[in-house]
Amino acid sequence: MALKTQLLWSFVVVFVVSFSTTSCSGSSFQEVNALHSYVDHVDDKESGYNSRAYPSYTDTIEGLKVMELIRPRTQLFSSRKLNTITGGIATSSAPAKTISVDDFGAKGNGADDTQAFVKAWKAACSSSGAMVLVVPQKNYLVRPIEFSGPCKSQLTLQIYGTIEASEDRSIYKDIDHWLIFDNVQNLLVVGPGTINGNGNIWWKNSCKIKPQPPCGTYAPTAVTFNRCNNLVVKNLNIQDAQQIHVIFQNCINVQASCLTVTAPEDSPNTDGIHVTNTQNITISSSVIGTGDDCISIVSGSQRVQATDITCGPGHGISIGSLGEDGSEDHVSGVFVNGAKLSGTSNGLRIKTWKGGSGSATNIVFQNVQMNDVTNPIIIDQNYCDHKTKDCKQQKSAVQVKNVLYQNIRGTSASGDAITLNCSQSVPCQGIVLQSVQLQNGRAECNNVQPAYKGVVSPRC
């Protein structure tokens, strides 16, 4: 029994360090090879620690094949790969044709270049074969643009210069995005250029800064990728978003790497990377410092991998919020491996609303260093914004199950190191802390009995 338990946990360690890393100067496409089949041979009846009320991670792993669920299955894109020298596209067919936004009238001199970008996109998207649309090394001012597909071409958007948002809030009206790529398959967006949302005018008028009417005006997201499958976004600077910097929504097979995402610490709601209803996504080798979550993962997202992430300032790496207004939300297969968080308000957070339903399951946080983080490890199944919601009568909750924290180090800035605030009606299950050492803080656990492995400090 002890041997099988030891082998299982050895497998977990092998699994979580076996992911390939992304080189910011090389290919983004690397097939992940994990020894996921081993778990099929483990008998959960001999898995060691057991609690009827709070099943352990090793109890619940069998049958669910949790590591297989977590494993991102990012596929090699058909007949395409990143050129390791130029960062461009190499195909087995004829060389890609290159066009520039300047060919369609863009000036890059402070004038409105929106129509030139629209015309250039239509030309590139409607062409056959491989196309590279270049944004030269100038500053281009553009209004909201929808880059729509499907495209006939295998399309690369190569940004050398800076794309800047207009500061005129009136042009957005009811538009909740600035740049949106919709239904574009096999798209590659690469730098080394910059996307600048010029968000200061929006921040000054947000409800958090100016609560008086008309503060309810919804600020747009800087860059949205919607229904984009087999997507690569690499080597870009994205800064000062009006609200969220980058959203991946309704996408399958995404590689986002070597991104620098920045905004002032006091800029409201400026999440770095937001993942919603997206499957098989890898975020790697990126530096994120904003006024909200560095990475937020919400409902419908599965097999999400984040590796080599530097986070701060901001609100940390967050799963949720889930279950707002009684909704049913699901997130599964999240793997965070190799993160450094400094001065953030939260570190590794799972947040669900009282009264919601659904699940957040099969989650691994591995190899994380946190320095002066206010809430380094936090699960909150009882979240409620009492200013706008009445949650007193709510009994249901989003299930939080099968969560592993492994090799976590750092310091708390608040006196709180580990907070597991689980629901009384739907308590957390399968919470495991292994080799966790957080200084300057205490641990508090409600409605959960975590399993400890190795040196864990503090403990509940």
UniProtKB/Swiss-Prot annotation:
Listed GO MF terms: polygalacturonase activity
The UniProt record lists the keyword Cell wall biogenesis/degradation: yes
A Pfam entry, by short name: Glyco_hydro_28
Catalytic reactions of this protein: (1,4-alpha-D-galacturonosyl)n+m + H2O = (1,4-alpha-D-galacturonosyl)n + (1,4-alpha-D-galacturonosyl)m
Enzyme type, top EC level: hydrolase
Signal peptide: 1-26
Sites where a glycan is attached: 280, 421
Entry annotation: catalytic residues: 292 (proton donor), 315
InterPro entries the record matches: Glyco_hydro_28 (IPR000743), PbH1 (IPR006626), Pectin_lyas_fold (IPR012334), Pectin_lyase_fold/virulence (IPR011050)
Bilayer-crossing regions: none
The keyword Signal appears for this protein: yes
Keywords per UniProt: Cell wall, Cell wall biogenesis/degradation, Fruit ripening, Glycoprotein, Glycosidase, Hydrolase, Secreted, Signal
Protein family membership: Belongs to the glycosyl hydrolase 28 family.
Annotated protein name in UniProt: Polygalacturonase
